[in-house]
Structure formats: structure tokens, C-alpha cells
Amino acid sequence: MHKYRTHNCNELQLSNVGQEVKLSGWVHRRRDHGNLVFIDLRDHYGITQIVFTDQNQHLMDYASNLCYESVITVSGTVVARSEGTINNKLLTGHIEVLAVECIVESASSPLPFVINNEKEAPEESRLKHRFLDLRREKLHNNIILRSQVISHIRHLMIVRGFTEFQTPILTSSSPEGARDFLVPSRIHPGKFYALPQAPQQFKQLLMIAGFDRYFQIAPCFRDEDARADRSPGEFYQLDLEMSFVTQEDIFNTIEPVLYDLFTKFTDKIVSKPPFVRIPYNESMLKYGSDKPDLRNPIIISDVTEIFRDSNFTIFRENIKKGSVVRAIHAPKAASLPRSFFDKMIEFAISEGAIGLSYIQFSETGEVKGPLSKFLTKQQLEILKATSNTSNGDAVFFASDQKDKAAKLCGKVRIKLGEELNLLEKDCFKFCWITDFPFYEFNEETGKIDFSHNPFSMPQGGIDALEQAKTTEELLALTAYQYDIVCNGIELSSGAIRNHKPEIMYKAFSIAGYSAEEVDKRFGAMIRAFKFGAPPHGGIAPGIDRIVMLLAEATNIREIIAFPLNQQAEDLLMNSPSYVDEKALKELSIMLSPTSRKIHKKNTGL
């Protein structure tokens, strides 16, 4: 018989009754019934009930003193449970093991929190003792799910003709939109590697090298703050790139992958390909966001023209100054109490708005609310038609500059969806956001900057760049860039790449980069483009966010085995940590006086 186990703890069935077996695992629960002691023995696979009887008093006394989470090996005989003790919640619930021997392989110290239920524990303690936290059923299953998702992704990509690559982790800094993690070079004093924010340049170089379809489960590193759906420091993405493709080719490739993935690992309704396509400007108008949650049926409408000649002075004057007026439809909200409308106004103010106004259309057709007296009957009818409002509904209004109004209305839309319980349940709704602006105006520098990915192909190519002369014309340029969104969460960004050196030089010059700077920062790419680059494009759905959605986790740390906390610290490994002076000298690093004082205090060196 094997030293530790003949079966795992999720394996024994009625067909095993009478067999001598050996099991190993953790003490999950212990119940002392006087003449019987029951131990729920848990391993990676499941739970088996072990029974100790007073026929072996010494062994039963031994079992009654076992600490939770101690590792034990038990030998015994499989017996059928009596009719009244069957546990249908367990796969092994029809049997139990009558113990004849028990060996403690490793005793557990007192636990910092309970393992055998999902009772909330302090996050600091959970992260500091992550090896214990990972034993808890929900988190344990999340990590298994993550592994299964990644394995299935690999299968789906390989059967579609993609080749898996590994690209360098130590590379050079590039403007991907976040701060780099820098690694000092010992051999080249004063120089630094950067951990890749994405394998962007390498995957494009692979296309130029003649590989047709690339993919990688790619680690990415960005020095940015944590959010519920964003881990600080490190994340993983399904990175892919394809040669000789259009935007539609990318869509047609990734949509079936996501549909297959989500239908395999969930019972919820999943959007079928082709997914809805929404141009960026339309998304910002209708949803107030470039990552709309389509489970929410509320649509935002532009009603600027209705108020341009209205009697409401505030909106009329705002419009003269270039502001817009937006209407947010609130279905079946007309009969709600005044406190509901006051709550929505308070919410808008908390989000930076001056206020929020509204009109109520009762079931009988009566019009009420602060703005109702400022609109004519005809204007009210146009408003109802424009905002798709019926009797029994309410409409909220916001007025501001276009971008500010869009963002505010987007937040109000989300809040209304929650307050009115409008979100469609048990579904994953996908959409594409397309035609992103190529450039944006940087308020801090007062200059034109890239809106998203600087390596995207501008729609219209070199002609569009050369014909756009004014700031307004430049900001109107769009890129072959697209995001995929699911239930209001951005899963991925992608683009058709700029593969022509002359277009890249021109695009960067508009953003304030000289040809010399472009050559210095992207020398490998520019050189490669001059030796025959195929048209190519790609996308990179986030693995962490996909698993987060499938696991129905509210925080991304719940689907990562060893995550950092909100302050980008690893409490388990005590990272980041101070290093000794010798290591700093080897790397030619000198700390500032303030940092040196802190370093000395914490290291004693």
C-alpha cells in the first residue's frame, strides 16, 4: 500500500465498500459525539468523512485532539453510511472510512482565521497568510478555474493556427500609457531595463519576421494604482497578433474564442457572435462611457436643440457658451418619492456636477418636476420622443461641456440602473467599441498627444494626417483601434497597426516627437518597417478580468494566487523590501538623502 494514499478525498464510492484504503489531507472539521469522533478530511480534490469509534478508545482520543488544518494520514475500511446520514452535497457522501490508524504528518499552529467556511476575514491577514487563504474552497476553486481557463485558451488558439511564443521580460522603456518598472543594469552602470507593459513591439516584430499568427499568455507590468478590476504591478493577457488582416478579421477570430470560453465555464446567457459594434462617439453619447454595460437598458439622449430656445435660462445660456444638454431616461420612476430624486441630485453633486434636474411624466400624462414649467407642450412631446420616454417614466438632465456632460451622465446612468434594479440578470453582454480618436488634447501640456496606442493605423492613412491642419481637425481623426467590453468591464484593447515608416514619423511628429526621437525610442521597429512589413493587427484580452467575470468575483485579488495589496505590497513575501548597501553599489545606485535616512533606519546599515 502507498505510504500516503491509495485514493484522493473525492474518489471513494459505494463500489469501494469493504476495501482497505489510505487517505491523506487536512483536518477540515471535527465533531465529537462522545462514543464517536468524525473528521472531515480534505485534500485538493474534495472531502471524505473519517470515523473514529470507542472500539479503539486510544485512537478516538487521539483524533479528538487533532488541530484543524493539521495534515494527517488515515488508514481504514470503507463502509456505507446509514440511510439517515447520507450527505448528497459530497461526492463521497454515501460512504465513510472507519479508521484503524492515524498519523500526524504535520501539526498546525493556531489559525489566524477560519478555513472551513467563507466567513469574512481581514484582508491584511488573508494576504499575509495567503497559503492558508488558498485552502478555502471558494478561492481554491477560483485558482483552479484560472488554470482551466488558460488551458482552454491555449487549445482554442492552437486549433485556430496560432503559434505560441515567449517574448523578453527585460526590455526597453516605451510609452504605453503607464509608468514602467525599471531594472538597473549591473553591467551597464546608469542604464536600466524596463519590464514590458505589453509585448507590443516584439509581437509586431514577429509579424515582420514572417510568422503569421502569434499568441502568448503574456505577463505585463505597469506601475499603476490598484482598482477592483486592476491589480497593481502585474497582470496577464491573451496577447495575439495576425498578419494580412483587417479589423473585421480580428473580430471574427476573437469573438468565437470568447463565446466558447464563456459558454464552457458558465451557465449564463452569453452574447453570440457577431458582437454589437458601437463607434466611440456614439458610445460616449448613448452610454456616457467607452465601456458601456449593455445589461443596463438606459440610453442617454442629446436634447440640446430642445433647450436652445426654451425658457430655462441656465441651460439656454450654457448652450450659448458651447455646452450641451443631455437627458437620462429613468423608466417607471415618475411615481417614486421626492427622496429618490433628491438622492440622485446628491449623487450627481458628489461626482462634481453643479446639480441635476428632472421631469416626471405620470401614468395619467401629468407633467411635474423642476423643469416642466420651462418647456412648451410641443417641446415636451419632442423630449419624450427623443429620450424614448413614456408616461410613468422620469427624465434627468445635465448640462456641461460635451466631455464632462458625457462622463457625468454615464455615472448617473449606472446609478439609475442600480437604484431602479434594471440590470439584466445572469448574462454576459459583449460589445465592441470602435473608431477611437487617434489624438487627444493634453490639458497639462497644452499639446496634442496620442489618445491610446501610438502604434495604431490612423483611418485614412497618411492623407488624413496631412490634410488635418487645425487642432479640431486633428482631434477628429480616428484610429483603427477597438476595445472589447463585457458587462461594463473593458476586457481588451486592440488595433490594426501602423506598418509604414512614413505614416509613423508623421503621426509622431504631430504629437511632438522628432524623427530622431522616434528612431531612438523605437529604433528596432522603424528599422524593421523599412525591410517589408506586412499589414497586421491584434488584440489582447485580459486573463485576470475574464476569470474575474467567470468566477463572479468582486475583486481581482480573488482570482490571483499571490496578489499584491492596494498599496502594491506583497505581505506574504514582504515585498518590496530594502536591500543592503553592497547590492546598491553593485548597481551604481545612490539613494537621495531622505531615502538614505529611511533605508538606514529600516536596515541598520
Swiss-Prot record:
GO cellular component, one term: cytoplasm
BP-aspect Gene Ontology terms: aspartyl-tRNA aminoacylation
Start and end residues of each stretch annotated as Aspartate: 200-203
InterPro entries hit by this protein: Aa-tRNA-synt_II (IPR004364), aa-tRNA-synth_II (IPR006195), aa-tRNA-synth_II/BPL/LPL (IPR045864), Asp-tRNA-ligase_1 (IPR004524), Asp-tRNA-ligase_1_N (IPR047089), Asp/Asn-tRNA-synth_IIb (IPR002312), AspRS_core (IPR047090), GAD-like_sf (IPR004115)
Site (Important for tRNA non-discrimination) location in chain: H33, G84
Keyword annotations: Aminoacyl-tRNA synthetase, ATP-binding, Cytoplasm, Ligase, Nucleotide-binding, Protein biosynthesis
Binding site for L-aspartate: E176, R222, H452, R497
Coarse class of the protein's main subcellular location: cytoplasm
UniProt binding sites for ATP: R222, D223, E224, E490, G542, I543, D544, R545
Localization in the cell: Cytoplasm
MF term (GO), any: aspartate-tRNA ligase activity
Main enzyme class: ligase
Family in the record: Belongs to the class-II aminoacyl-tRNA synthetase family. Type 1 subfamily.
Protein function: Aspartyl-tRNA synthetase with relaxed tRNA specificity since it is able to aspartylate not only its cognate tRNA(Asp) but also tRNA(Asn). Reaction proceeds in two steps: L-aspartate is first activated by ATP to form Asp-AMP and then transferred to the acceptor end of tRNA(Asp/Asn).
Subunit structure: Homodimer.
Protein name: Aspartate--tRNA(Asp/Asn) ligase
Biological source species: Rickettsia typhi (strain ATCC VR-144 / Wilmington)
Lineage: Bacteria, Pseudomonadati, Pseudomonadota, Alphaproteobacteria, Rickettsiales
Protein encoded by which gene: aspS
